[in-house]
Amino acid sequence: MQKAIFLDRDGVLLNDAGQYYIYKTDDIIINNGVIDALKRFTDMGFLLIVISNQGGIAKQIYTKEDVEKIHSELKKQFEIEGINITEYYYCPHHSDVEKCLCRKPEPLLIEKALARFNIDPDKSFMIGDNKRDIEAAKKVGLSGIKIKPNQNLLDVLPHINA
């Protein structure tokens, strides 16, 4: 079985200060420490998987295509640095608009990744800046690491056991 680091997108990988929704490529600001931390996680043998709530789709603030453009640009920027994100999963729903099973704190997107990539939850972690990220992790047996929004991702390294 493989091990993985599951990462929330906005507030963990991307700086979301001053904006609740990030849906334009011009708004991409990678948080401090992200590049170095992702390289370290990769060197430790972890797959990197993004799990993100994108409720702005359900609220018709932006589209799935906007989210795909952000992920495509992120993929490009990370690949330049030699970083491979194994997969990007996102929930397009919002609880104010419709109920679903994939919006964190529900663990469906994490469960899909666990099954698809044969990941051992006991050796894997979820890093998020919101209580719901950690709740989703706990529901499937992952260790959850809560950081402050836009915190330097290198700060979590002492909490990751390879």
How would you name each of these model-derived features?
Residues 34, 38-71, 87-94, 137:
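Substrate-recognition element of Asp-dependent hydrolases with the DxDx(T/V) motif
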Residues 13-32, 57-66, 81, 93, ...:
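Metal-dependent phosphoesterase signature
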Residues 26-27, 50, 83, 153:
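Sparse recognition of residues in long alpha-helices and their boundaries
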Residues 5, 9, 65, 72-85, ...:
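Asp-based, Mg2+/Mn2+-dependent phosphohydrolase catalytic module
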